[in-house]
A protein has these predicted regions:
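GST-like domain detector, emphasizing the conserved glutathione-binding G-site
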Residues: 1-134, 155
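Generic structural signal for individual residues within well-ordered alpha-helical segments
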Residues: 93-96, 168, 193, 206
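Terminal-tail/helix-coil boundary detector
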Residues: 207-213
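A late-sequence structural motif
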Residues: 202-203
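Short, solvent-exposed turn/loop segments enriched in Gly/Ser/Thr/Pro and often Arg
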Residues: 36, 164, 212
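Substrate-binding/catalytic groove segments of enzymes
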Residues: 179, 206-207
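GST-like fold's C-terminal all-alpha helical module
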Residues: 104-198
Length: 213
């Protein structure tokens, strides 16, 4: 498919970054249109495309799609390039499991509590809430240990064949490990640490802070 691809998203959104990683790994050319869902006027306009006023939204020609997992599945199915969903049913199941774990149990403690309080808030000249960071780290440990077990299984998160799980986790880990406590927690898990050392060197990760326009 050759129609133009645009990601509508907020530059700080981890899920906008998930979508961008998938597009990059699929070798799809795309542009990013900055939309701030926290701005009331922009959020209201965004509801024309997303009834809940969230990001990201993918626009592919006349086709609009919201919800990150739907976007990444579409990107893998609609475009040529490396497969991001394994053919092996057990590997595909592990991929779906890892995504479900990090979305359901990892996003809030890893991103909203640890990263947002330890890294983002000080960068915005706000005080770090140490109690919130501690609570986030405690909850994150269970998530990281679950992901370590999935990585140890050897079907996904190897750093070799990239799947949609790498895209979801890559965006989360990029933020989480910017907090020293997050980086230390990952380093304590040998399989996950090995995966992250390889994943973080990929252009899809190293280019996240340079947003295409």
């Amino acid at each position: 498919m050759k129609a133009s691809v645009t990601i509508l998203g907020f530059r700080h959104s981890v899920y906008q970054r998930v979508a961008r990683i998938a597009l990059h790994e699929k070798n799809v050319e795309f542009r990013v249109k900055e939309v701030d869902p926290f701005d009331p006027e922009e959020a209201e306009r965004l509801r024309d495309l997303h009834p809940f006023g969230r990001v990201p939204v993918l626009r592919h020609g006349s086709f609009d799609l919201y919800e990150t997992s739907a976007i990444t599945r579409y990107v893998d199915a609609a475009f040529d390039g490396p497969r991001l969903v394994p053919e092996d049913p057990r590997a595909a199941a592990r991929m779906a499991q890892a995504i479900a774990v990090v979305d359901a149990y990892g996003y809030w403690p890893m991103i909203r509590q640890v990263f947002a309080r330890r890294v983002f808030a000080p960068n915005e000249d706000s005080a770090c809430n140490e109690a919130e960071v501690a609570r986030g780290l405690a909850a994150s440990r269970t998530v990281i240990e679950a992901l370590e077990a999935i990585a140890a299984d050897g079907r996904i998160l190897t750093g070799d064949a990239i799947t949609l799980a790498d895209c979801h986790l890559g965006a989360m880990m990029d933020y989480f490990t910017r907090a020293p406590e997050g980086a230390a927690l990952i380093q304590s898990q040998p399989h996950l640490d090995s995966w992250w050392r390889r994943m973080r060197a990929r252009p899809s990760i190293t280019g996240l802070d340079q947003q295409r326009r």
